[in-house]
Structures are given as structure tokens and as C-alpha cells.
């Protein structure tokens, strides 16, 4: 789904506006192996404070689900960089799983991650995603047992996304040892590519994780902080940061 050594930026759709999100995506796409696009939700419990605030800004600005699909549709006119929708189950449930995935596919989405859908309850999601040709991505955390990691790998058709513990996402000064321990286990167990998202904020972090075996590195909070500070005018700062993190 992405080439080895990729940077995978995360942005929240609609923060601070749908038009701005499209501009931001186009500003960073040339340095991105894939892009995660978050669907705002009113109770984003699995995210840290930075990304939670991003969800709230988007919702306060009038975000509607259709805006996300329109953003991807417009993005597809200019770029073929893979887009992975990152969402909670509630927005999917409100629309209906089949309709949500169908709309995602029609707009040009490549993959989908439902943050709070455990792999053991994902059979319908897997079936519909397979029918629609949408890649599936599942999360694994440091406390995920090996047997569960095998199940996650088997269910994932895009990549396995290794994260810090729920609610602790955020830019850090150093990558915690738990990241490297989980990555080591995942490389032993998983047949899929693995992407790691552990508070990456510097190129040094990206290099450390890639050298430790990650196929891709996700960066979210460091970019969302830029949007929080610069709002509609974050485009150039985002481009510079993503280029720096990608080592280009």
C-alpha cells in the first residue's frame, strides 16, 4: 500500500476547514507514501489531547461526513497517493457500514481503519471492504498479545499500524522503548508491512524507527500542532515539516 521507508502523515478532515484540508493534503502529498485522513468524532477517546482538539475544531467549524469524501474526491484529481480513512465506528454506524465504505470507495479512498473496532468483531467490515476493494488496517499496541497480533495481521490487507497506548498519542522528545519492543515482535509475527506511530516529531525519530524495521512511520500530532497554531495559513509550515520528516 506504500513503499518501504515511507512517511505517512495524519490530518483531521475539516480542521480548520474542508478547503484548508484539501490544500494541506496537496501541499504534503509529494513527500508522503500514504496519508491518513481522520474523520472527526465528538468522543475520540483513543486519541491524545492534540488530536482530540483537532476533532473538536473541525466539528465546531461545521464538519459533515460528506466533506471528507469531497476532500478525497478533489484530491484524487491531482494525486494518486494512497488515502487511509481513520474513523471511529459511530460515524460509520450512523450511515451504515456498506454505504460508508461504498462512498469511501467512490471518492477514491484506498484503505480504512476503524479505531474502536476490535478485530474479533470485524467480520462484516472485512467482508464489505473486500467486496469494495478497500484495504483494511488494524491497530496493535504494546500490550497486544502475540496471538492477537497474529489475528490483526491476518485481518489487515493494507498494513498493521503499531501505536502507543490509547489516549497517549502526541509528539514526544524521544521514542519510548515500548515502540521498539512492539516493532520487534511485529516484524517477527506479521506478514504485512508495519507502520509505527509513536509521537514522532523529528527526522531522527523517523530514521530510528525505519532502521529498527518499520516499513512506514506515521506522524500526526506534530502536524496537528502546526495547524492549531497557524490555522488556515498552515500550508507552507506543513509542507516544510513533512519534507523535513521525510528526509527530502
Swiss-Prot record:
GO molecular function (one): tryptophan synthase activity
Keyword hit for Methyltransferase: no
Active-site residues, as the UniProt record annotates them: 36 (proton acceptor), 47 (proton acceptor)
Protein name (Swiss-Prot/TrEMBL): Tryptophan synthase alpha chain
Pathway the protein takes part in: Amino-acid biosynthesis; L-tryptophan biosynthesis; L-tryptophan from chorismate: step 5/5
Any one of the GO CC terms: cytosol
Enzyme class: lyase
Alphabetical UniProt keywords: Amino-acid biosynthesis, Aromatic amino acid biosynthesis, Lyase, Tryptophan biosynthesis
Catalytic activity: (1S,2R)-1-C-(indol-3-yl)glycerol 3-phosphate + L-serine = D-glyceraldehyde 3-phosphate + L-tryptophan + H2O
Cross-referenced HAMAP family: Trp_synth_alpha (MF_00131)
EC number of this enzyme: 4.2.1.20
Function: The alpha subunit is responsible for the aldol cleavage of indoleglycerol phosphate to indole and glyceraldehyde 3-phosphate.
Coiled coil regions in record: none
Name of the gene encoding the protein in the UniProt record: trpA
Family: Belongs to the TrpA family.
Subunit description: Tetramer of two alpha and two beta chains.
